Design a protein with these regions (language model features):
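A detector for short, charged/polar N-terminal pre-domain segments
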Residues: 1-17
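Structured beta->alpha junctions
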Residues: 12-15, 47, 59
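Polyanion-binding surface elements
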Residues: 14-30
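Short, well-ordered coil↔helix boundary/capping segments
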Residues: 17, 37, 60-64
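A short, structured beta-strand/loop element
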Residues: 29-55
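C-terminal structural segments of small proteins and small subunits
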Residues: 57-80
Length: 80
């Protein structure tokens, strides 16, 4: 298992204790470069519907609900 996959596994196990920089690394890997607007990083997803993933820096940590959204989007992308 690679570094990115290990991070995703950690996100699944504990979405409340995720560093913003780690979440950005994972999102950059799966979804490409973000569009940054203010304090939000917005990533596009390749499917119809809600085609965005929105993450914010909360004092160096990522918000837990946003981490869960990223994990869900990665699973959808992988077809799991």
């Amino acid at each position: 298992m690679g570094f990115i996959e290990n991070l995703v596994q950690q996100f699944e196990n504990n979405p409340r204790n995720v560093g913003f920089a780690d979440l950005c690394k994972v999102c950059n890997h799966y979804f490409g470069k973000p569009r940054t607007k203010g304090s939000h990083n917005v990533y596009k997803t390749p499917w119809q519907g809600d085609p965005r993933i929105n993450i914010q820096n909360d004092n160096g940590k990522a918000k837990a609900y946003q981490v869960r959204q990223v994990v869900k989007a990665i699973k959808k992308l992988q077809g799991v």
